[in-house]
Swiss-Prot record:
Transmembrane parts of this sequence: none
The species this protein was found in: Haloquadratum walsbyi (strain DSM 16790 / HBSQ001)
Function: Component of the A-type ATP synthase that produces ATP from ADP in the presence of a proton gradient across the membrane.
UniProt record similarity statement: Belongs to the V-ATPase V0D/AC39 subunit family.
Record text on subunit structure and interactions: Has multiple subunits with at least A(3), B(3), C, D, E, F, H, I and proteolipid K(x).
GO biological process: proton motive force-driven plasma membrane ATP synthesis
Protein name listed in UniProt: A-type ATP synthase subunit C
Keywords, sorted A to Z: ATP synthesis, Cell membrane, Hydrogen ion transport, Ion transport, Membrane, Transport
């Protein structure tokens, strides 16, 4: 990994400026009361202007919003790589591979559910390292097995792990073995050759938290699925909060899991977020609450060591949340949901 020419001061200053332009609670309250056309007009008056103007002649309503959100997200993250040099560039590029992982899981889920490829394409985020050609090839796959074969043939880091997990998927009939293989591969490459020093110690701590929360999500997803699968077998190495055995136990008792987090190093920073987790009455709400907790935690780390990669990662998470929220509001409005129902759909 390159260690010379890193420029955290410059990148952090640019990121802070971008962060200040993110939508706040007042703007979300406005969006909830708007039609999709009104949401698009408001977006045109903000950082999404370029995308709305470029796409406005071809799309309208929710389609326009969806495409503008995804293109803006990719542009914002391309800017991060354009600004960064040396070691900082390497760290950001590795983290942004999360969108390759997202796209692999999105394609697999789409094939599994029989969703039209055009609809699956709408949910892809082209902000990682996968080329458009590779993503289009995956969208054309006629089966999950074929998609896995294409990932292997393209030499991606996910191919061999997915091939190893395919038999477990075939036997269980649930996607968890495949999704877990993607997550494990992603985090393995993130942690590989990561030299921990003053500039990266907080980043390593954040990655531990992200892995801890991913393990918690996976454990509860397994418990909800009813599949005869041991959660310990799908434990992701690299966290600090759970052992594989403890995770298998917590999968059966959410209160014990929450209490374990409260008593951990995360407890003081996440008291409010943990209250949200405690009151979540569905798996989706539970996962959203965990995502909120992770974002809240990343914010605290960014202030501890501002001249590192951590503020950049915190911005990436915040930008993702903004895009997810605007998308949820637009889709909810199109589906005829009430204001209160829409508010439950975003973070």
């Amino acid at each position: 990994m390159s260690v010379s020419g890193s420029n955290p001061e410059y990148v952090t200053a640019r990121v802070k400026a971008r962060e200040s332009a993110l939508y706040d609670d007042e703007e979300y309250r406005k969006l909830v009361r708007m039609t999709p056309a009104e949401i698009a007009r408001l977006m045109e008056e903000s950082d999404y202007e370029r995308e709305i103007n470029a796409l406005g002649s071809r799309y309208s309503g929710v389609d326009l919003i969806e495409y503008a959100l995804n293109q803006n997200l990719a542009r914002q993250f391309d800017d991060l790589l354009r600004w960064a040099n040396g070691r900082l560039y390497d760290l950001i590029a590795r983290y942004l591979r999360k969108f390759d992982a997202w796209n692999v899981k999105t394609v697999i889920r789409g094939i599994y559910s029989g969703t039209e490829s055009d609809t699956v394409n709408d949910d892809l985020i082209r902000a990682g390292e996968f080329s458009d050609e590779l993503l289009d090839t995956l969208l054309d796959a006629g089966s999950i097995e074929e998609a896995v074969e294409r990932l292997s043939a393209a030499g991606t880091i996910y191919g061999s792990e997915l091939e190893s997990a395919y038999d477990d998927y075939d036997e269980s009939g649930v996607l968890i073995p495949l999704e877990n293989a993607v997550d494990r591969t992603y985090y393995e490459q993130l942690l590989a050759d990561l030299t921990v020093d003053e500039a990266t110690a907080q980043y390593r701590e954040f990655l531990e938290a992200e892995i801890d929360f991913r393990n918690a999500q996976n454990a509860f997803r397994l418990a909800q699925s009813g599949a005869d699968i041991d959660p310990a077998a799908y434990y992701i190495d690299g966290g600090s909060l759970f052992t594989a055995t403890e995770l298998a136990t917590f999968a059966q008792n959410r209160n014990e899991l929450i209490e374990a987090i409260r008593e951990s190093r995360y407890g003081d920073d996440l008291s409010e977020a943990l209250n949200q987790i405690e009151t979540a009455d569905s798996l989706i709400q539970f996962e959203r609450a965990l995502d909120n907790a992770l974002l809240e935690y990343s914010d605290t780390l960014g202030t501890v060591h501002p001249l590192s990669v951590t503020p950049v990662v915190s911005y990436i998470l915040a930008k993702e949340r903004e895009v997810d929220n605007i998308r949820a509001i637009a889709r909810g409005r199109e589906a005829g949901l009430s204001d209160d129902e829409i508010k439950q759909e975003f973070m």
